[in-house]
Structure formats: structure tokens, C-alpha cells
A protein has these predicted regions:
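Extracytosolic ligand-binding ectodomains
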Residues: 4, 8-12, 17, 22-25, ...
Length: 374
């Protein structure tokens, strides 16, 4: 029984009032089927994030239909103060878990009421560290399928320590806050383990060429460099290194998971990023089913499908163990899903770091065993 809670164009007060009235209706609608497992899908239905919200709904609803989950759809406006009304709808519908939550503004208001109702909130995208710190401090039931920023730097440092010892190493950021913090965490981890980079620099992003940077790397004798920058900037560095005949091993981070334009990435560039979900062995059958139904398994579709699978399994575990859902999730229980085994650590982040070393083959990224040129 889908319940669609969608604000119209009224002022904010009327939106909140109408949502609260609809939650009462939702409660009556679910009164006769309170024992059925249900999933709340909280995602934008209009506005700038409508396409992302559509991906969340398509993936979660496809899994729910297959698993027999009741569905409660709630619009996520991403406005400050909207979380309370969204929580009312989820609590009234007695959902087993709520997934989606693409906006931090929503989570700030939705989490306290969900704590009282023992309803886990599983965000597919929010990485805000302060929000998770508050969640752990106040016991809010927030769990992240999106990897933390620290997961990225931890994996990159691990790979550099494993594969680049004995080489002249460079670390380059693009001056943005995200990039500088990423590179700082990597450098700290390396130095704590006795590996000091030979070269560090801040590049100027969005330039037509990076020959000057490439020549500085060459003069310093750098053979391996990590570049914390957007994919196109890394592609320009790789192109210019090739034109200068510099055999440079280049590795980027999760920002490399982007469109291959305007400058195409040359083969052999490395990236530490999440694998394409539709390429995972565990996803092949479901990806085929989705394509057969006219749904391309891209973006949030497979993560949302996995979150629905997790919700169904969690509902069974709650009944079997007579424990609240958040307690089971925080206890490290692992669930099999379309994107692999998923579980959470005591910090409510994924227990298995999803970042993997990959190599660009000229068409797409593929798994790589070692961070070296081929």
C-alpha cells in the first residue's frame, strides 16, 4: 500500500500541517497490517534532486515488490525544519526502517522522533561528519550506506603504504577544502607509518594544461603521485605527463568516478573509488531484471535496492530476536544484498570499507591488484 506524502506549493506552515494530517491517515491505513514489514522511502519527488529521488524510489520499490514489503513514500523537500513532519509519517506508518535521506537538512529533524520509535534511518548519501557525531552522542538511529570521508583517505593511505614504498611519492591537492583535507589525512597516515612524501603541492584546477606541474614532478624525481582533484584535472595531468614522456604512476580518489569529459582519461590511470555496482558479481541477476523492466541500474538504484533488501531481512531479525532494529544494526549483523554483504560498525558506518583500487582501461574502471602502471 503506497502512501504518497508530497508537499504542494503552500507556505511552509501549511505544508507541515497537511503532512501531519496525512500521517494520521497513514496510521489508519496501516492499522490493519501492522505486522507486515514496511519500508519508508524518503526522497525528493520534485526540485533539483528529483532525478536522484527517482533513482531511490525505483530501486527500493523494485526490491519491495519482490520481497513483499509495504511501501510508504514521503517527499523530501530538503528544507530546514521539514524533518519533524516526515518523522510523523514514518512513525504513524510503523515502518520497519526508512531509507533515502539525500539531504542533511531532513535528518536533523527526523532522527529524534525515530529514536523514540526505534526506526532506523538509512541514508544513501549523507556524509556530514558533524551529523553522525551528534547521532552517536544522542543515540539517534542513523546508519550510513554512503562511505565516510575518512574511509576514502584510509584506503588510499593503505594502498600507498602497501605498493609505493621505495618510490619517490608526490601528493597534490587542488586547493578545495575537500581535497586539502583528504590529502592532509593521507599525508598524516603515511608519516605515522614512517613514509614521508618527497613532494607536496597545490595545483591550480580548471586549467587547459598542467605542463608546469608535470615538469616540477619530473625535476623532483617523482615516479608516483596521488592527485586529489576532479577527474578532468587528473586527465589533463596524465595527458601532459605522456606528452613530456614522463612515466608517471598517477592515482586519484573518489572524484574520479565522474563523466569522462571534456578531456578523456588515458589508460592506466588509477583511482581509489567505489566499483560500479552493476559490475559486481552479486548484482548481475538483479541488474538484468531491472534492465528488462526498462530501468538502467545506475546512480542510487542498486544501493536503494540493497537498502530495501536489508530492511526486509532486518524486519525478520527483529521478530526472531525480539530486539529493536537499531540495536541489531549497531551490533554488526551482516546482511546479504545485491551490492554485497552490508553491516555497520559501532560508529554506524559501513563495517567494510567500500573503496577499491581500480585502473582505467580506456573505457571504464576495472579492479586492480597493485597501484602500478601496466
Amino acid at each position: 500500500l503506497p502512501i504518497n506524502i508530497k508537499p504542494g506549493q503552500q507556505d511552509f506552515y501549511h505544508v507541515m500541517l497537511s503532512l501531519r494530517l496525512l500521517t494520521i491517515i497513514a496510521g489508519f491505513a496501516f492499522a490493519g497490517s501492522a505486522s507486515a514489514a514496511s519500508i519508508g522511502i524518503v526522497a525528493p519527488q520534485n526540485g533539483p534532486y528529483e532525478l536522484l529521488g527517482q533513482q531511490v524510489r525505483q530501486g527500493a520499490k523494485a526490491a519491495a515488490a519482490k520481497l513483499g514489503l509495504d511501501v510508504v513514500e514521503i517527499h523530501e523537500s530538503c528544507e530546514d525544519g521539514s524533518g519533524g513532519a516526515i518523522a510523523d509519517g514514518l512513525v504513524a506508518a510503523k515502518v520497519s526502517a526508512a531509507i533515502g535521506f539525500l539531504c542533511t537538512e531532513t535528518l536533523q529533524g527526523v532522527l529524534p522522533p525515530l529514536k523514540a520509535a526505534a526506526i532506523p534511518a538509512i541514508t544513501l548519501s549523507s556524509r556530514a561528519p558533524i551529523l553522525m557525531e551528534d547521532a552517536l552522542k544522542y543515540g539517534w538511529p542513523l546508519f550510513r550506506l554512503a562511505p565516510s570521508d575518512r574511509a576514502e583517505s584510509d584506503r588510499i593511505a593503505e594502498i600507498i603504504l602497501r605498493d609505493w614504498k621505495g618510490h619517490s611519492i608526490g601528493l597534490v591537492d587542488d586547493g578545495t577544502i575537500y581535497s586539502r583535507e583528504l590529502v592532509d589525512r593521507i599525508r598524516s597516515a603515511l608519516e605515522e607509518n614512517g613514509l614521508k612524501p618527497t613532494f607536496t603541492d597545490t595545483m591550480r584546477p580548471n586549467q587547459e594544461q598542467q605542463v608546469a606541474l608535470v615538469r616540477r614532478l619530473a625535476r623532483t624525481g617523482i615516479s608516483h603521485v596521488f592527485v586529489g582533484a576532479e577527474r578532468n584535472d587528473v586527465a589533463i595531468i596524465a595527458r601532459d605527463a605522456a606528452s613530456e614522456n614522463l612515466p608517471l604512476t598517477i592515482m586519484g580518489g573518489d572524484a574520479m568516478n565522474a563523466a569522462n569529459n571534456p578531456v578523456p582519461l588515458v589508460a592506466n590511470v588509477l583511482a581509489v573509488t567505489r566499483p560500479a555496482y552493476d559490475a559486481l558479481p552479486s548484482a548481475q541477476a538483479i541488474a538484468g531484471e531491472l534492465r528488462g523492466a526498462g530501468i538502467e541500474p545506475e546512480g542510487y538504484i542498486l544501493p536503494a535496492y540493497a537498502a530495501a533488501e536489508l530492511t526486509a531481512a532486518l524486519a525478520e531479525a527483529v521478530q526472531a530476536q525480539s530486539k529493536p532494529g537499531p540495536e541489531i544494526l549497531a551490533g554488526g549483523t551482516v546482511f546479504k544484498t545485491v551490492i554485497g554483504d552490508l553491516g555497520f560498525n559501532p560508529s554506524h558506518d559501513l563495517s567494510d570499507n567500500p573503496y577499491r583500487l581500480q585502473r582505467w582501461n580506456g573505457q571504464r574502471f576495472e579492479p586492480a591488484d597493485k597501484a602500478e602502471r601496466q
